[in-house]
Amino acid sequence: ELVQNNPSVPPEYLIGPHIGQSTNRKHKVLSKKFLDFCLDSDILDMVEGILGENIILWSSGVFCKPAKLGRVVPWHQDGQYWPIRPLAVCSVWIAIDDALPENGCMRFIPGSHTGSHLYQHVAINEHNSVLNQGVKPSEFDKSKAVDNVLFAGQLSIHDVYLIHGSNANTSGRRRAGYVMRYMPGTSVYDREMPVGQSSDLAQSDFSERPIWLARGVDC
C-alpha cells in the first residue's frame, strides 16, 4: 500500500513511513502501524543489548526492490551519510519478503565495522544506483562479501560502520524490507546536516525530522 500510494518516490527508498513522511499525509493508520513496529518491546530489548537502556528512534524506511527493476545499492557505510554525533547507531532490518541472492539481498563485508572507521567514499554517477557515494574499491576486499539471506519475518541487526550493499533484483520476485534506525541517548541528532547524501531521486532532509525517545532517558 505504501509503495502504491507513492508512485513518484523510488520504491528502494521510502523514508519515514512511521511519521507519514513518505506518504501523502492521509495514511495516519498506516504510519501508526510502522511506529508500533519501531517501538515494539521485543525489538527494543534486542537494541538495548547493543546500545544500552537509553534508546532513541531517529529513522525508519521501506526498501522495496521490484521484480526485474530493483536498483543497485553500492558498497557503503551508513555513517558516511547520517547526522548522528558521535556515530553510534544500529539498524534493525526486517524481511517483508524472502531476501535471497537472486532478488538482491543485502551483502556485507564481515568485520568491516571493527575499529569504528569510516573508509574513503567516492562519487557514483550511475542512474541505477540508489546512492551517489560508495566506498572506494581499493579500501576493502570485495571477495570476502557474504550474502545476508533472510526469510520473510526474520531480521538482522547491523552496525553503522559495516560495509554493505546489494545487487539489482534481476529475478521475478520482489524483495522488500523494513529497517528501523536507533541511536543511544548519549548521541546527538545533528540538524545542522540538512540533506543526506543519497541519490538525486531520494534526498533525505534531516533538518526537521522528528525523533522518538523509545526507551529510557535522553542523556
Regions found by a protein language model. Name each.
Residues 1-75, 80-84, 121, 193-195, ...:
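Non-heme Fe(II)-dependent double-stranded beta-helix
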Residues 8-10, 155-157, 161-219:
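Non-heme Fe(II)/2-oxoglutarate
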Residues 14, 77, 126, 130-142, ...:
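Short, surface-exposed loop/helix-turn segments at secondary-structure junctions
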Residues 62-69, 79-80, 87-88, 96-101, ...:
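Short acidic/polar capping segments at secondary-structure boundaries
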Residues 67, 109-116, 175, 181-187:
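Short edge-strand/loop segments of extracellular domains
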Residues 71, 84-88, 139, 170-174:
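A generic structural micro-feature
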Residues 76, 83-101, 149-152, 157, ...:
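Short, conserved beta-strand element in jelly-roll/cupin
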Residues 99-167:
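Double-stranded beta-helix
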